């Protein structure tokens, strides 16, 4: 029977081992599933519990070995009893102190405890009979050693143990009540933790949104980098285009220089032609002398000359047209040269603007370089922080090791239950106080929210008042604007004021760019602060996760402790049953002993002694079991104390984290409220800014249009002035040419009149009639020549008057446009002043806000303005680049037009060259023919002198006159040559043109002579001369 009981105990302990091992496996699975949510301390505690159970098994086996011996002495039994009494005394004193300090006492009695075990008495009686049968078979040698005193001692010990069991039952009931309370507390904490988890999930969502925003920022930064690269490529392309335009300009300059050189060469050629023409005139003069010597021949010649004069007038008109075309070409050359200089000026302006763009790009590159430096600094700081974190982690690990050592020491030390309970009460009081403080804080937070809303409403009202004031100011400004219009119509604003306004606007733009750079720097600082806040939030989250893991570990430990307590309760109930059975058997034995004492039979005594020995063995066994259970209870109590200490520490940590969490919640709510308010303000500001931007864009567009119109008007004005000057020059040149033509005509008429008067004396009546007819015809022709010239003068005067009237009208239009543009510039300046005033008022309103919210407002405004300014800057760069591309295209088109004009001029010059070559060839042919004719005339006239003796006198007289005239002409020619040598200065174009006209008149005269020869072939001399000319041809 003893072996079966030992097997039962071993099975019980083995079952406990299996249960604990299963729990360990489950815990390990939970660890893997929960992703390190449970600490390693729980696993270590479980291992320690296994170690304790192994020790218990070893102790039980040792005790079994002691009892399993066939023989043992009574002295050893007595010594064991004494030791047990001492242990029980110490245990009883310990339990008494604990029971006195328990708050709640249980009303459960021993009868109620035994009522549950009435059904198991029959089984116990059967077992006792089996035990008696077993022990009666043993030797009866040891039964004589027992006495009645030992039995009495055993009965007393049994009674004392019953009392101790009752006390332990009360303690167990109290412990149950306490654990129920702890379960309720743990459930409440679970609910709170669930709420905290929900809040954390909300925060995670917010953080996810922030990460998305950060990604968007990164994408925009990448986009800006790409655009910078594109701008650099466009800049290189623009540089190439500028170099090409410069090369084209140099080629144009070279072409113009070549044209000038060609013109100089042509002037020299014209001078050579003029000298040749003078020689031809001299020879012509000699020929005319020969004509005068022959009266009869001159009659026919004079008639033909009249025809020649008519043809000459027509050819003069044609020549004048050619001359006018040449003048137009000269004017076009001048206009092209002026356009070339204007293009140079535009190129200079473009180069200056390009330099400005390069400066802007350099500034931007500098800012990027600064950003890179700041980025390297931040990376260095991050490395330092990582090193610090590693150092702190090492310190934390060392502290954990120390904490483990301290925990082991604390487990060895036995804390008093009174102190623990007092601390629990104090902590409960503190927890209640914290709840009350939390309620107060929530109320204060709501009160502050209400105050903030009231302040925001007041600020809104103030802003509305400012808007009303601005509307009033706008109305007043509009009235002032109308007054200024009236004043401006009276007074003309100088162009200097416009330039000043433009300069002021440029200075404002420069200031805005500087502000933009400052705002970018501030945005960087805000980004760093945001990064630090995110890091702190991550640290807090990690701490909270560790707390949750600790709470789960404590809950698991509590469950394990509850299961252990239930097992101990079951074992205690079994022990009580055994003790009651033992008491019943002792009573039966006492009765039998009394019967034996009355009967005094020896055999019955032996039997009773055997039974007593068996009962004592069972008693020892039960006592050993009882001691082991007591030791387990003590160990469990110690573990419970340690658990309570650990729970207190966890509660303290939880309270601290709760406080931190509540503070963070308050801060987050305050930030959310401020952010919402700031978002509303931001939206209002954005609307205002959008309206202002739209107005600014409109003003800029109108301003640019007016500037373009001004430039166009200025160009038109210059062109009109140049055209007027050119028209005046054309008129003056035309007048001078007409005067010279009239003088030449009058001289020729005078000469012809002299010749006619000389011929009248010599000629007959027929000649007089012819002369009279000729004179009448000449007068009519002179009147006809004068009339068209006068009509031409009147026509040119009318044209000049019309041009002057048109120019005046254009000047009036230009002045009106200038006035409008000045008015619009004033309006633009007024709008800028209004914007500056609104900004000042807005800054004053911000200053009136509490200092606690100023920092948040600044941060918010900086973050909001950051992207707007960057986008504005990018848009401005794009617009500037597009403008420069347009201007470059315009310059290219202008250069192409200039090249086409140059090509047209070159073609015209080539045509003129060809015509000049043809004229030269014709003139050379005529000179050759005239020389041949003169030589043959001299040869033919020499033998005919004898045939004309009657006419020698007249010829001599004529020769004398001719000799005198030749001397005079020679003197004149010598003087002319001297003047030419002295005055080697270049002859003007007008004189060259008049000389060309004279040359054409000579050609016409020669053609008339040829006709005269053909008409007067009857004359012998004329026949001979004509034959000579034909042979020469």
Curated annotation (Swiss-Prot):
It comes from Plasmodium falciparum (isolate 3D7). PANTHER family: COILED-COIL DOMAIN-CONTAINING PROTEIN 39. The keyword ATP-binding does not apply. Possible candidate for an effective malaria vaccine as determined by epitope response in sera. Keywords: Coiled coil, Merozoite. One of its GO terms (biological process) is cilium-dependent cell motility. This is Uncharacterized protein MAL8P1.12. Residues 212-326, 405-582, 615-771, 797-1019 form a coiled coil. GO terms for cellular component: axoneme; cytoplasm. InterPro entries: CCDC39 (IPR033290). Pfam families: CCDC39 (PF24161).
